[in-house]
Amino acid sequence: MAAQKVGLLFGGRSGEHEVSIRSAAAIASALADPSNRDRYQVLPFYIDKEGGWHSGETAAQVLANQKPLFVEEPSDRWQFPADCRDVEVWFPILHGPNGEDGTIQGLLTLMQRPFVGSGVLGSALGMDKIAMKQAFAQASLPQVAYVAVNRSQVFSDPCRYTSLLEQIETELGYPCFVKPANLGSSVGIAKVRDRAELEAALDQAAALDRRLIIEAAIDNPREVECAVLGNDYPQASILGEITYDSDFYDYETKYTDGKAQLLIPAQLSAELQQKLQELAIAAFQAVDASGLSRLDFFLDSQGQIFINEINTLPGFTALSMYPQLWAASGVAFPDLVHRLIQLALER
């Protein structure tokens, strides 16, 4: 049987461009593994920071160097490489806005080719934290209290703005977290302890996104993650825990070597682990996810569980939590990539 042509799509216009390149390089290496070499042929497609598409040698060079392409003159963003037609199944590994929010998934759907990961609905719900929480609430999943805010409320007349501040203080209190609803990698998130910090954080978040979410803080929570794999009958991995010395798991902590430690497996009772796995699958199904997702949870000092979020297209470097959780669960990286492609073809 001829090798299937896999369109490996990476880069993108989000702030997670470099992470996407590293994820794609790891996936390309897994597809070159002896177990996959005869099954798949990789066709790399790179989207530069201006939105231009590149294929062939240019995309392969970015993949090999693991460095973004410097574009002197933006290419025609409406012109897709001709070899897109050769792709039999797509593996998009674009992180952040335009990559995991349903945008690229809609384009691939129009191309009438199968692709790895969630469809338009699951991706959109997984990206927008407000819509995500509404879906979780519908499924009766445990969450911290939150207030949803539009940018217009932040930049409104003083009376309405003061009313918003009072609502947040009454319903959530301090400390609390202010987050843009549609940005990944903890970008724009701030922990606030008084009204002055709240106002500054709202201004910062509203400059980044039209939709904001403010969440009640949990005192010194444990942060536990679970990987999910599958379509209609998903499976959950063992659990992992993230530990760090900073005030919360912010962008700097997430992407600076040595600032955070991954503990796999997490030290949890068998009963608690089973409960978290069940909740991970329930959350996966609540947003109509498919293929893969990583579920993030908080545990308070009493052992109470709160679901934080779902990431429908998690980091995929060899050091990322998602593949590490599956490796610890007995699924090696090359086999994980193979399974994801097969799940795309089955859907």
Swiss-Prot record:
Protein localization: Cytoplasm
Binding locations of ATP: 169-224
Necessary cofactors: Mg(2+); Mn(2+)
UniProt remark on cofactor binding: Binds 2 magnesium or manganese ions per subunit.
GO biological process assignments: cell wall organization; peptidoglycan biosynthetic process; regulation of cell shape
Positions of disulphide bridges: none
Keyword Manganese: yes
Residues reported in the UniProt entry to bind Mg(2+) 1: 296, 309
InterPro entries per record: ATP-grasp, ATP_grasp_subdomain_1, D-Ala_lig_Van_CS, D_ala_D_ala, Dala_Dala_lig_C, Dala_Dala_lig_N, PreATP-grasp_dom_sf
EC number(s) from the headed UniProt entry: 6.3.2.4
Biochemical pathway: Cell wall biogenesis; peptidoglycan biosynthesis
Occurrences of domain ATP-grasp (ranges): 133-342
GO molecular function, one term: D-alanine-D-alanine ligase activity
Keyword line: ATP-binding, Cell shape, Cell wall biogenesis/degradation, Cytoplasm, Ligase, Magnesium, Manganese, Metal-binding, Nucleotide-binding, Peptidoglycan synthesis
Reactions it catalyzes: 2 D-alanine + ATP = D-alanyl-D-alanine + ADP + phosphate + H(+)
GO cellular component: cytosol
The protein's enzyme class: ligase
Signal peptide span: none
Database matches in NCBIfam families: D_ala_D_alaTIGR, PRK01372.1, PRK01966.1-4
Family indicated by similarity: Belongs to the D-alanine--D-alanine ligase family.
Function field: Cell wall formation.
Alphabetized PANTHER family for the sequence: D-ALANINE--D-ALANINE LIGASE, D-ALANINE--D-ALANINE LIGASE A
Protein's UniProt name: D-alanine--D-alanine ligase
Lineage summary: Bacteria, Bacillati, Cyanobacteriota, Cyanophyceae, Synechococcales
Gene from which the chain derives: ddl
